[in-house]
């Protein structure tokens, strides 16, 4: 009897800049249409999501700006395009909700992360409202204040 292969689990890559630049309001899980060489590269975590975003066009969602570095051993017979536009698989209801929200000023649809769900690659996309410069500074101040508080609590425990 053949041994069952374990499915890879966990996050492949995250877009930390998206959380810095946007207030995340709603999250969606989307499937992806990928080529074989892309899946092999994803198993090796060769993915960058820094400037990736979602474009809604003709009732479909497309992911632009994600970069999958091709493995030399996996893409020998195919001309690999690392930054090609990839189709996202969403329900009609989710697509309609995203399309209506993106029409409003200041809202955008961005990719937050890619992860394995059983043997499938999923993309977590989010509807976010763009942060202003002062919002980013406020977030940084709150984070620093939280760190100072944790540091004070930790030091207080050591003094006793």
Swiss-Prot record:
Q: Which GO terms describe its biological process?
A: trans-translation
The reply on keyword Signal is no
Q: So which domain of life are we looking at?
A: Bacteria
Tell where it localizes. Answer: Cytoplasm
| Keywords (A to Z) from UniProt | Cytoplasm, RNA-binding
GO terms under cellular component: cytosol
GO molecular function (one): RNA binding
Ranges for the region named Disordered are 131-160
Which InterPro entries does this UniProt record tie to the protein? SmpB, SsrA-bd_prot, SsrA-bd_prot_CS
Indicate the principal place this protein occupies in or around the cell: cytoplasm
Q: Give the family this protein belongs to, as stated in its UniProt record.
A: Belongs to the SmpB family.
Q: What HAMAP family does the record tag this protein with?
A: SmpB
What does this protein do, in the record's words? Answer: Required for rescue of stalled ribosomes mediated by trans-translation. Binds to transfer-messenger RNA (tmRNA), required for stable association of tmRNA with ribosomes. tmRNA and SmpB together mimic tRNA shape, replacing the anticodon stem-loop with SmpB. tmRNA is encoded by the ssrA gene; the 2 termini fold to resemble tRNA(Ala) and it encodes a 'tag peptide', a short internal open reading frame. During trans-translation Ala-aminoacylated tmRNA acts like a tRNA, entering the A-site of stalled ribosomes, displacing the stalled mRNA.
Protein name, as recorded: SsrA-binding protein
Annotated source species:
Pseudomonas fluorescens (strain Pf0-1)
């Amino acid at each position: 009897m053949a041994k069952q292969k374990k499915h890879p689990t966990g996050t492949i890559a995250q877009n930390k800049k998206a959380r810095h630049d946007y207030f995340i309001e709603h999250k969606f899980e989307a499937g992806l249409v990928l080529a074989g060489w892309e899946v092999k590269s994803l198993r090796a975590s060769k993915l960058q999501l820094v400037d990736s975003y979602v474009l809604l066009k003709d009732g479909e969602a497309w992911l632009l700006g994600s970069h999958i570095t091709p493995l030399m051993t996996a893409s020998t017979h195919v001309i690999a395009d690392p930054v090609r536009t990839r189709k996202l698989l969403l329900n009609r209801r989710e697509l309609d909700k995203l399309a209506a929200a993106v029409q409003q000023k200041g809202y955008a649809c961005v990719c937050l992360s890619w992860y394995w769900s059983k043997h499938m690659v999923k993309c977590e996309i989010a509807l976010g409202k763009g942060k202003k410069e002062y919002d980013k500074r406020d977030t940084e101040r709150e984070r620093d204040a939280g760190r100072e508080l944790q540091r004070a609590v930790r030091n207080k425990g050591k003094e006793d």
